């Protein structure tokens, strides 16, 4: 299948990953509410796509407990090394770091919930990524996208673009939220059509 034309994206962050663990981020992004909406509960399988520092990975791993699994997917080998070190330090045995491809998360098993947290604007071939992700979703799985309004090049992307691309990849919009008071951040929830 020919690769779709690449859309404009932001340059992926390559600096110190610990900046993503800023104080107050849990409250600002309402991450417990996000996990509630995505149905992340004990025993579930979750994918953190574009895991970066593992900020969400760690929170999801604690939520799903020992009977659940979190796949921490990133295309940056340094991020995977960072996450691997972090989960050892935090003694989390339910996290599986995965070095994915730009258009395929390479998930080894079906997942119940997925979150792309401030990642979607960096995906050059989002429709292909979502199609590959779709094949790894359990029945009733939810896919969440948290991002900022923008044009793709400024570490943000218009929510209408995300909705259109997800629709083209075989997803339907289930819910949408504006959690952050700045009017820029949004949270979209999709399911398979």
Question: Where are the predicted features?
Answer:
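Class I SAM-dependent transferase core
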Residues: 1-47, 55, 82-85, 116
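A short glycine-rich, Lys/Arg-flanked "PGG" loop and its adjoining helix->strand segment in the class I
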Residues: 61-62, 127-142
């Amino acid at each position: 299948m020919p690769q779709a034309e690449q859309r404009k994206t932001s340059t992926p962050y390559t600096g110190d990953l610990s900046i993503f663990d800023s104080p107050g981020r849990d409250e600002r992004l309402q991450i417990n509410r996000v996990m509630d909406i995505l149905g992340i509960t004990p025993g579930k399988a979750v994918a953190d796509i574009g895991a970066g520092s593992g900020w969400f990975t760690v929170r999801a791993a604690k939520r799903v407990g020992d009977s659940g699994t979190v796949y921490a997917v990133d295309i940056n080998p340094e991020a995977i090394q960072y996450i691997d070190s972090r989960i050892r330090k935090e003694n989390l045995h339910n996290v599986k770091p995965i070095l994915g491809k730009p258009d395929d998360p390479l998930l080894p098993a079906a997942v119940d919930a997925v979150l792309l947290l401030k990642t979607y604007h960096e995906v050059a071939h989002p429709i292909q990524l979502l199609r590959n992700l779709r094949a790894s979703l359990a029945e009733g799985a939810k896919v969440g996208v948290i991002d900022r309004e923008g044009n793709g090049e400024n570490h943000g992307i218009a929510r209408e673009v995300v909705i259109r691309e997800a629709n083209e990849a075989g997803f339907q919009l289930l819910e949408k939220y504006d959690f952050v008071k700045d009017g820029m951040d949004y949270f979209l929830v999709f399911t398979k059509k």
